[in-house]
Amino acid sequence: MGGTFDPVHNGHLVAASEVAALFDLDEVVFVPSGQPWQKIHRKVSAAEDRYLMTFLATAGNPQFTVSRIEIDRGGATYTIDTLRDLRAARPDDELFFITGADALAQIFTWRDHRELFELAHFVGVNRPGYHLALDAGLPTGAVSLLEVPALAISSSDIRERVGRRAPIWYLTPDGVVRYIAKRRLYQGAS
């Protein structure tokens, strides 16, 4: 599951759990982006903070792991590089790339987007208020769309709530709430 995870929240966790159950996945690997190329004009929390928050959020589920693959690579991070690396490391595994349907709608702007569908099956998770149709020019058979239980939670909403000192309990796991407070993340985000 790829994303900025700034911060990771319960919507991400529910989506990962639902996709794992639907596709009978052995493992869901969360891959926090290193330096997301599409967010160079937006302030993004340090990669190490996003990695640690994702680790805290997923630690209780033995089916979830967190990879540093993009963080340790350095420089701008591209999904194609990550999928190539994962394919090389796991040549016999069937790879599924889980992302938000809103991100999937932009996939034709991603580097080497045609090759992406050869490396993994893409699963787009529709969030409340956003719906992507499979007829959006996406390759047949290479993409699945999934509706998950309605959790109207977004990372940007959490950052904004922290910035105005509103509670974020129950929107993201307790360990992430404490980590955000301890590191004083998102203080100026309102």
From Swiss-Prot:
Assigned keywords, A-Z: ATP-binding, NAD, Nucleotide-binding, Nucleotidyltransferase, Pyridine nucleotide biosynthesis, Transferase
EC annotation from Swiss-Prot or TrEMBL: 2.7.7.18
Listed InterPro entries: Cyt_trans-like, NadD/NMNAT, Rossmann-like_a/b/a_fold
UniProt cross-references to SUPFAM superfamilies, sorted A to Z: Nucleotidylyl transferase
Record's keyword annotation contains Thylakoid: no
Keyword Nucleotidyltransferase in record: yes
Pathway: Cofactor biosynthesis; NAD(+) biosynthesis; deamido-NAD(+) from nicotinate D-ribonucleotide: step 1/1
Gene3D superfamilies linked to this entry: HUPs
Sections of the chain in a coiled coil: none
PANTHER family: NICOTINATE-NUCLEOTIDE ADENYLYLTRANSFERASE-RELATED, PHOSPHOPANTETHEINE ADENYLYLTRANSFERASE
Family the entry assigns: Belongs to the NadD family.
Function: Catalyzes the reversible adenylation of nicotinate mononucleotide (NaMN) to nicotinic acid adenine dinucleotide (NaAD).
Protein name, entry field: Probable nicotinate-nucleotide adenylyltransferase
